[in-house]
Every structure is written in C-alpha cells, then in structure tokens.
Swiss-Prot record:
It is found in: Nucleus. Keywords: Developmental protein, DNA-binding, Nucleus, Paired box, Transcription, Transcription regulation. Residues 7-63 are annotated as: PAI subdomain. This is Paired box protein Pax-9. Interacts with KDM5B. It comes from Callimico goeldii (Goeldi's marmoset).
Length: 341
C-alpha cells in the first residue's frame, strides 16, 4: 500500500522526504539483487532512486541488515556524573590543565577504561559548557581575595600640580551667561595652561614661573599676553605722515615753484640717491657759540628760485638752504676747539 502523501522521484515513484524506505521494498531490493538483476534495473522496476538502492545493498553486504538507522546502535553514554565530577576536580586543582591530560588522568586513576573513556573533544565540551562558568567564578573570587586595597587615583595633570588646593571659594567662580555652569567638583582655578599646550612645549611656562617666583608683584601670564593685539597700542597721529607734519607737507606742495629746466622729481626717491645727513657736533653749553649771523635765513625757503632734484615731496628745496646752519655749527665747533687748546 503506497502512502497517500509524498513526492515523486525521477523514476515516477512516490517517496516521503525524511522517512526511511518501507521494509517490504528494502527486502524486495535484496531479493532482486540475489537473483542477479542489476541495481539500475531494480531502481526502474521498483521506481526507487539509484542512490537508495545502492545504499541499501551496500549496507546489506556489510552488516547483513536491511533495517534503517545507525549500524550497531549508538555509542553508550560515557559522560556520566562521576566522570564530570572528576573532570571538575582536576580543573580546580590545575586550572591550566589540557583536555588530553584530563583524559590520561581518567585512565590512570581508573575512573574510565579504554572503551568508555570520553574523547578529547567531549572533555573540552564538558569544560566549556558545564565547568567553564564555575571555574571563572572561582578565579574571580580568588582574585578579589588576593587583590590589594585600591589606591587613590592620581589627580589630573599630576606632573604640573596646582599650587593651591581646590576650595569652595574657587569652585564658586562666576560663569558668563549662556555658558553651562561647571559643578564644584570639576571647577578648578586656572593658573597656567596644561602640560600639553604649546607654551609648555616651547618652555615659556618655565620663564613665567621664574618671573612670578622672583617678583613679589603680579606678572601677566602667557594667556594674558595673547590677548594683547595691535588695537591696544596707541595709533599714530592722523596728521603725521612718515613722521612728518602733514601741515608742513601741504604748504610745501601748495607753494611749489615751476620746473626750471630740470626733470621732474616724483614723490619717491630711492635711498641710494640721497646723501646721508651729517651728524651735528656736540657743543658744551658752557662754551661760547661763535656762529656767523649769516647762517640764519630771514625769508621763506619756497620763495627762492633755485631748486634741487633731491626734493622728496614733489617740491623744490631752495639752493640757499644748503645747510648753512650745519656749516655754522661746524665752524663754531672748530673755533671752540681752537680756543680751548
């Protein structure tokens, strides 16, 4: 009687996946094989797959059985509670013992014989599943017993410790609006940048420390220096241009004379074309000054017709102002020197 449900194989036969072939069909396969019929012809006649026929005939030739299942039955249980207990004892005595050493111990102590001793993989599975958690708990307890008392943690930045301890007054530093308040246990007075800042790496901090230690007065810190910019310095007077009075320059430009045949001079003159100013000689205030009165100029300089190409501001310098005052000073210094000798 064929089953009412199942699948159809490549030969048109019906089989149920996951269930063994019925014993009647198995016996018929063996009988046809003993009659000398080839396995391929048996599979076509009984509409059973080639692999199934070959497997049943091979098992019958090896064991003489046509029944399904493992050949000879399953292996008897070897991981008995007694064996597990001895394995736990070995592991507690020597936590670093290997599975093959436990297997040898079981044979040496007579717990098992060579027929029922567990394999190395079975012992490893027992250690991992049944004894692993207990062994880890025992190691943790023993570690806690032998662990020394916890030492206080090092404070932050212990290499460059702060000179004064953190007090309640220091913790109450006001914070600007919009910035979240720092709790008292975290807030600390800032005296210098941390050890990882650029100022500490470059050695600026040691210089400021020496200054602050040697001087009783308050010295600005490095972070205060960085706040100083160009805006803090007084700006130059708006009426001065390159150190010269703007009013004087405007007057010279306003009353400049027409060119007298010489090429025009721009507003910029290179430094190489200008002669250096002579340094006036030092004259003692207790000596008489014998400069000639002709060294003084009565009129304005821009009213003279003569000019020189050394005018740096697009105006002409009178030729009569050939530094007569400087020449008079030189003459006066020579006369004073001669009189002193």
């Amino acid at each position: 009687m064929e089953p009412a449900f199942g699948e159809v194989n490549q030969l048109g036969g019906v089989f149920v996946n996951g269930r063994p072939l019925p014993n009647a069909i198995r016996l018929r396969i063996v009988e046809l094989a003993q009659l000398g019929i080839r396995p391929c012809d048996i599979s076509r006649q009984l509409r059973v797959s080639h692999g199934c026929v070959s497997k049943i005939l091979a098992r019958y030739n090896e064991t003489g059985s046509i029944l399904p299942g493992a050949i000879g039955g399953s292996k008897p249980r070897v991981t008995t509670p007694t064996v597990v207990k001895h394995i736990r004892t070995y592991k507690q005595r020597d936590p670093g013992i290997f599975a093959w050493e436990i297997r040898d111990r079981l044979l040496a102590d007579g717990v098992c014989d060579k027929y029922n001793v567990p394999s190395v993989s079975s012992i490893s599975r027992i250690l991992r599943n049944k004894i692993g958690n207990l062994a880890q708990q025992g190691h943790y307890d023993s570690y806690k017993q032998h662990q020394p008392a916890p030492q206080p943690a090092l404070p932050y930045n212990h290499i460059y410790s702060y000179p004064n301890p953190i007090t309640a007054a220091a913790a109450k530093v006001p914070t600007p609006p919009g910035v979240p308040a720092i709790p008292g246990s975290v807030a600390m007075p800032r005296t210098w940048p941390s050890s990882h800042s650029v100022t500490d790496i470059l050695g600026i901090r040691s210089i400021t420390d020496q200054v602050s230690d040697s001087s009783p007065y308050h010295s600005p810190k490095v972070e205060e220096w960085s706040s100083l910019g160009r805006n803090n310095f007084p700006a130059a007077a708006p009426h001065a241009v390159n150190g010269l009075e703007k009013g004087t320059l405007e007057q010279e430009t306003k009353y400049s004379q027409a060119p007298n045949g010489l090429p025009a001079v721009g507003s910029f003159v290179s430094a190489s074309s200008m002669a250096p100013y002579p340094t006036p000689a030092q004259v003692s205030p207790y000596m008489t000054y014998s400069a000639a009165p002709s060294g003084y100029v009565a009129g304005h300089g821009w009213q003279h017709a003569g000019s020189t190409p050394l005018s740096p501001h697009n105006c002409d310098i009178p030729a009569s102002l050939a530094f007569k005052g400087m020449q008079a000073v030189r003459e006066g210094s020579h006369s004073v020197t001669a009189s002193a000798l």
